[in-house]
Each structure stands twice: as structure tokens, then as C-alpha cells.
């Protein structure tokens, strides 16, 4: 089977890289199974030389205002034998409506268990965690940053959306490097050019699990800025950060921003780490926490359906309320249970490792075959 994946012209996002990474890494395995996979970024007749044409949502994100580009994209998607639209947007709540026109099949990294949410006329925001912040009057609705809901879309279309795989299969190595930006650049370069991870020891994923009793940081509260371009993100993340700050004194809390080497040192010394939502529900922080064997504290993820599903309540992570109001009680409760936190940390790391392609590519390969059956 020949598959062509269409990317945007001269644009590579971190999310796109992490979504495609398992394909790069497993290319030889997939070739042995009869798959020929090509990446292209130009709209020409070569796109028709395949069994399945896959259009990444970043094509619309970066070229959606270009009428000539979009007309050509529609033409090739109609002429192709079969077209998939691969939505790699951050949140389970956001769709590309033109993706329904382009793809005969619409795949998304994650989706809400409650499909009726999408067509509910009372939603203020497609992202469920944004909607929660607005409806509880924590902030006023900011129409500039909030798209319309999807109540005008047929329920049948929503119900037909399928799940591909999420960015947890990307590359989140946490070894020391002069800067995180440079590290990400090296990882992108080696997967783009070499199509496989470098074999040197320093470039391998590390699944450290330092002696838990020796760790001297109780809680790590270091995450991206309270993005002022989004009031819901700003409120949500600040609520978690403020609760963590209020615990300083009773517990040793590391919060704020650190040079990359210092941050990675803290990852090896921490027992627990907070990872609130951002534009999407899953964040890179989750995966850094899992890799380093830290107990993940995260807003409740039970509303989300995804693959792989790393989030098993009170087994691989510890959920807290979306307004962060119960963080203090949660921490007080779990630290009093002998060995409980360490077990959560080990479970989270082992589950993440079981899906990670550096450890075992077979789960992804099976998923890939399901998606492209």
C-alpha cells in the first residue's frame, strides 16, 4: 500500500514533528509489511500516485487563507483514490470544518467521550476546559480568541470521527543540552534527515527512576507561561501555580522558570509534578514527567478518548479538579500513604514506556495497520 502524507509548504511545527515521529522511526518495519510512505509538501499530480492521500491539518492551518492553494487541495483530494484528513490540533474540542470536505475519513488525535458536547448549542467554547472556565465566571468570554461551536454540524459527521494516535509517541528526551530550543532542533534534524534516532548513548531515551526517598523536591510546578493571548489558559494555569505556591513551607516546591540544565536536574529530583492544560489537554510536560518517573498530578482527564491512553485515574496519574481547588487536599492525602506516590510514579513510567517506540514499536505498528486497514 502506498501512502502519501501532505504537509504544509516550508513549515514544520513541533506538534507535526511529534505526530510523524513514530512513522519516521518505524519506517523499516512498515516497509517490511508492504507500506510505502512518502512525505510531500507540494500540490502536484504526484499526489495521485498513491492508495491513500493523507492531508495534515497543518496544511489548512498555514494555507487556509490562500484560495488558490485550497482550491487545488480540494481538487487533488477529490481525484485521489481515498483521502484521509489527519487533524493534529492540540485539543479534543477543535475541528477543521474544511477537513470534513477534504477527507473521506476524518482522523483526530483525541476526542471527547461525550460526542453530544460538540453539537450542544449552549457551549461557549469548543474546548471543554475553556468552556468550563467561562461558564463558571472565572473570566469573561473573549470572542476574539474563541471560535464558534459546532452545533451547525450534523451529529452523524461528529460520530464518524476516528482516532489516530497522539503526540505521546513523539520524542521527549530530557538529557542536558545548552538550550531546549537547540535540543528540539537537533531531534527534528536527525528524524528529518536520518529518519531514525541516533544510536549514541546520549541520544537515547532515558527512563530514569532515581531512589524515591532520596529526592528532595516534593512538588515541581514549572510549566509554560500563563499565555496572555488566551485568558482561559492564563486563568487555568495560574490557578494551579497559585495552589502550588501556597504549599511552599509545608512542602519543598520548585516553581517558575529555570535554565534547561537546571530544569532537567529538578526532573530527576522531584517526587510529584503538576501539568495543567494548555491549548490542548495533553502537554509535553506529561511525557517529561513520565519518562523521569515522577508522580503526575493533572486536571481530570476522564472526559478524553485517545490512543495511547496514558491516563488511568489513581494508577498512572493523580487527577485534580479543573479549578485546582483540591490540590492541597490531594497532596496531603497521597503523601500520607506509604509508598503510594512512588507506585503511581512507577506505573506512569511503565505505561508510557510500554507504548514508546524506542522500547517497543509493535503497539504503534498495530495501531498504524488499524488506521490504514
What are these regions (language model features)?
Residues 2-42, 47-50, 55-282, 299-304, ...:
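Nucleotide-sugar donor-binding catalytic core of glycosyltransferases
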Residues 264-373:
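Catalytic binding pocket for nucleotide-activated donors in carbohydrate/polymer assembly enzymes
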Amino acid at each position: 500500500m502506498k501512502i502519501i502524507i501532505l504537509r504544509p509548504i516550508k513549515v514544520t511545527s513541533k506538534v507535526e514533528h511529534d505526530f510523524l515521529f513514530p512513522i519516521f522511526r518505524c519506517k523499516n518495519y512498515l516497509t517490511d509489511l508492504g507500506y510505502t510512505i512518502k512525505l510531500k509538501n507540494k500540490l502536484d499530480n504526484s499526489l495521485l500516485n498513491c492508495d491513500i492521500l493523507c492531508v495534515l491539518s497543518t496544511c489548512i492551518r498555514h494555507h487556509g487563507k490562500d484560495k488558490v492553494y485550497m482550491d487545488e487541495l480540494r481538487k487533488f483530494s477529490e481525484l485521489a483514490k481515498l483521502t484521509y484528513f489527519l487533524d493534529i490540533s492540540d485539543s479534543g474540542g477543535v475541528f477543521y470544518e474544511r477537513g470534513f470536505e477534504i477527507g473521506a475519513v476524518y482522523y483526530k488525535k483525541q476526542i471527547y467521550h461525550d460526542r453530544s458536547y460538540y453539537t450542544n448549542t449552549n457551549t461557549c467554547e469548543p474546548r471543554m476546559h475553556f468552556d468550563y472556565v467561562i461558564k463558571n465566571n472565572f473570566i469573561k468570554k473573549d470572542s476574539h480568541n474563541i471560535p464558534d461551536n459546532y452545533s451547525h454540524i450534523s451529529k452523524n459527521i461528529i460520530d464518524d470521527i476516528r482516532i489516530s494516535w497522539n503526540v505521546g509517541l513523539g520524542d521527549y528526551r530530557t538529557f542536558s543540552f545548552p538550550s531546549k530550543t537547540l535540543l528540539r532542533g537537533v531531534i527534528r534534524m536527525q528524524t528529518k534527515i536520518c529518519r531514525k534516532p541516533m544510536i549514541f548513548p546520549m541520544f537515547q531515551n532515558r527512563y530514569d527512576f532515581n531512589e524515591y526517598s532520596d529526592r528532595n523536591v516534593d512538588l515541581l510546578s514549572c510549566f509554560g507561561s500563563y499565555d496572555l493571548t488566551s485568558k482561559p489558559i492564563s486563568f487555568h494555569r495560574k490557578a494551579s501555580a497559585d495552589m502550588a505556591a501556597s504549599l511552599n513551607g509545608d512542602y519543598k516546591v520548585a516553581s517558575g522558570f529555570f535554565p534547561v540544565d537546571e530544569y532537567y536536574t529538578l526532573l530527576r529530583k522531584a517526587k510529584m509534578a503538576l501539568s495543567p492544560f494548555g491549548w490542548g489537554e495533553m502537554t509535553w510536560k506529561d511525557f517529561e514527567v513520565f519518562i523521569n518517573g515522577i508522580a503526575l498530578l493533572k486536571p481530570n482527564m476522564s472526559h478524553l478518548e485517545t490512543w495511547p491512553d496514558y491516563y488511568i485515574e489513581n494508577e498512572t496519574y493523580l487527577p485534580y479538579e479543573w479549578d485546582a481547588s483540591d490540590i492541597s487536599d490531594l497532596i496531603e492525602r497521597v503523601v500520607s500513604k506509604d509508598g503510594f506516590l512512588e507506585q503511581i510514579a512507577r506505573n506512569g513510567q511503565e505505561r508510557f514506556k510500554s507504548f514508546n517506540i524506542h522500547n517497543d514499536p509493535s503497539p504503534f505498528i498495530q495501531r498504524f495497520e488499524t488506521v490504514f486497514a
